[in-house]
Amino acid sequence: MNIKGSDNGSFIKGSPENDIIDGGKKNDWIDAGNGDDRIKAGDGQDSITAGPGHDIVWAGKGSDVIHADGGDDLLYSDASYPLYVTDPHRVIPHSGEGDDVLYAGPGSDILVAGDGADVLTGGDDGDAFVFRFHDPMVGTTHCYTSVMDFDTKQDRFVLDAADFGGDRNLFDANFINHSKGFPGEFVDTFYNGAAEGAHGEHVVVITDRGFASAAAAATAIDHEARGDIIVFHDQKTLGQDGETHGATLAYVDSANHAHAFAHVDNLHDMSDLTSLTAENFGFI
C-alpha cells in the first residue's frame, strides 16, 4: 500500500501488508506495522516504528528516532539514498543532516550513519555499521557517530569507498578501499597490539595505552598513510552515559594526523579492544 503524509505533520499508520510510506516535510509519527516496508520520513523531527518484517527506513533531514523491531532491516540516518529510482542522489551539503537515533532491534541489520551526531544501536544478532564519509566537508560542524552495542563476536564496521547505494558516487563516499581483492571483503592488513608494533597496517587497534586525541594516536604509530583506520581507547571523550570512556575510530589523512569519526560506547576499556579482529572491519 502507498501511504503519503501531509506537509503539515501527520500520524501515519501502516497496514499489515508491505507498505511504501512517505512522511512529508513536517514532524511525523509513523507506525508502519507488519510487512516488509519502505519508509521515507522526509524533513522534520520524526518518530518512526518500522515494526516486524524486513524494512528499509530513510530518516531524512532533522533529528529523528527509528525503532526497527524484528527482521533484517536497513536503516539510513538521513536521506542518503532514494526511495524511488527517479529520486535525485544526495550531495553532501555544507551543514549537518540532523542528529538521529537508530534502534535496529533483533535481526541482522545494516545501520548507515549520516553526518550528524548519530546514535546507533544494532540490537541482537550480527549487525553492520556503515560509515560513508570520514570527516565533514569544509564549513560543517564536526560530529561523529556513537555506536552503543558493538559485539566483537558478530558485528562489523563497514567503511564505504564506492557508495553503499551502488552507483560509486565518490562524492558520497570517501573512505579508501582496503579490502582483500574486491569490495565487501575484510580489511587486507590488520594489527592489534602495542602502538610501537604497528608498521603501516590499514587498520591498527592500539591496546597498550589510551590517547586524548586522534592525532596523538596517529603520532604514536609508524608508517601510517592516508586512508588507514586507527582504533584506540579514548581518554578524553565520555560516552552517552556521561561517565564511561570508550573506543574511538579515526581516519588518517596525513602523517601524524587523523580525524575521529565514530565512538564505541560499550568498549569501555583497552582490554575490550584486544578482541577486535580483521573480521570486524569490512570495506565496500
From Swiss-Prot:
Disulphide bonds in the chain: none
Subcellular compartments: Secreted
Tagged with keyword Transport: no
Gene Ontology molecular function: any one: calcium ion binding
Positions contributing to Ca(2+) binding: 100, 109, 118, 127
Expression induction: By naringenin (flavonoid).
Segments for region (Export signal (aspartic acid box)): 208-222
Region (Disordered) residue spans: 1-27
SUPFAM superfamilies in alphabetical order: beta-Roll (SSF51120)
Keyword vocabulary terms for this entry: Calcium, Metal-binding, Nodulation, Plasmid, Repeat, Secreted
Family annotation (InterPro entries): Hemolysin-typ_Ca-bd_CS, Hemolysn_Ca-bd, RTX_toxin/Mannuronan_C5-epim, Serralysin-like_metalloprot_C
Residue spans of the Hemolysin-type calcium-binding repeats: 13-30, 31-48, 58-75, 94-111, 112-129
Keyword Endoplasmic reticulum: no
A GO cellular component entry from the record: extracellular region
Pfam family name, one: HemolysinCabind
Record-linked Gene3D superfamilies: Serralysin-like metalloprotease, C-terminal
Function comment: The NodO protein may play a role in nodule development by direct interaction with the root hair cells or some other plant surface in a calcium-dependent manner.
Protein's name in the database: Nodulation protein O
Taxonomic source organism: Rhizobium leguminosarum bv. viciae
Lineage of the species this protein comes from: Bacteria, Pseudomonadati, Pseudomonadota, Alphaproteobacteria, Hyphomicrobiales
